[in-house]
Amino acid sequence: MANAEKTSSGSDIDEKKRKRKLSNRESARRSRLKKQKLMEDTIHEISSLERRIKENSERCRAVKQRLDSVETENAGLRSEKIWLSSYVSDLENMIATTSLTLTQSGGGDCVDDQNANAGIAVGDCRRTPWKLSCGSLQPMASFKT
């Protein structure tokens, strides 16, 4: 009987070993599947992030180009503003000089109300085009960058 118990108990041990081995294999298989899924998810996430990086880089490049364009246009407009300010200042100086000259000369080309033959009244001199020597003050052509 002791032999029968050993045999029975030996086969129980073998059965337990076999079940444990099978359980370990199944656990290892689940672990491998879990690891594989994690790897696939990570690869998918990397791919997605790389795509987003590429899109953001392209967007950044487009914004940089637009910024450069706007900065160039802004520099041109600032230059044109300086030129126009100088032009207006020169025109104001010419008007002041011309007004002063007319005042000092007693009216210049304008005639007073008593000279009816000329047909020009006082004050009409401001409506007549002056031929001043200001060749350097030509209007600036449209400025494009």
Curated annotation (Swiss-Prot):
One Pfam short name: bZIP_2
InterPro entries: bZIP (IPR004827), bZIP_plant_GBF1 (IPR045314), bZIP_sf (IPR046347)
Residues covered by region (Disordered): 1-39
BP-aspect Gene Ontology terms: anther dehiscence; cellular response to glucose stimulus; cellular response to starvation; positive regulation of DNA-templated transcription; regulation of amino acid metabolic process; response to bacterium; response to osmotic stress; response to salt stress
Induction: Reversibly repressed by glucose and mannose. Slowly induced by Pseudomonas syringae. Induced in roots upon cold and salt stress but then repressed in leaves. Promoted by low energy stress and dark-induced starvation.
Region of interest: Basic motif: 16-37
Domain bZIP per the UniProt entry, residue ranges: 14-77
Tissue occurrence: Expressed in both shoots, including young leaves, stipulae and trichomes (except in cotyledons and hypocotyl), and roots, including vascular tissues (e.g. in both the phloem and the xylem). Present in seeds and pollen. Restricted to vasculatures and roots in the presence of sucrose or glucose.
Compositionally biased intervals (Polar residues): 1-11
Localization in the cell: Nucleus
Example of a GO MF term: DNA-binding transcription factor activity
Keywords of the record: Activator, DNA-binding, Nucleus, Transcription, Transcription regulation
Ranges in coiled-coil conformation: none
Effect of a null allele: Reduced requirement for exogenous sugar for seedling growth and higher rates of true leaf development.
GO cellular component, as recorded: nucleus
Region: Leucine-zipper, residue numbers: 46-53
Disulfide bonds: none
Its job: Transcription factor that binds to the C-box-like motif (5'-TGCTGACGTCA-3') and G-box-like motif (5'-CCACGTGGCC-3'), ABRE elements, of gene promoters involved in sugar signaling. Activated by low energy stress both at transcriptional and post-transcriptional mechanisms. Promotes dark-induced senescence and participates in the transcriptional reprogramming of amino acid metabolism during the dark-induced starvation response. Transcription activator of the mannan synthase CSLA9. Recognizes and binds to DNA-specific sequence of CSLA9 promoter.
Subunit structure: Interacts with ZFP7, BZIP4, BZIP9, BZIP10, BZIP11, BZIP25, BZIP42, BZIP44, BZIP53, BZIP58 and BZIP63.
PANTHER family in the record: BASIC LEUCINE ZIPPER 1, BZIP TRANSCRIPTION FACTOR 44
Similarity annotation: Belongs to the bZIP family.
Protein name stated in the entry: Basic leucine zipper 1
Species in which this protein is naturally found: Arabidopsis thaliana (Mouse-ear cress)
Gene that encodes the chain: BZIP1
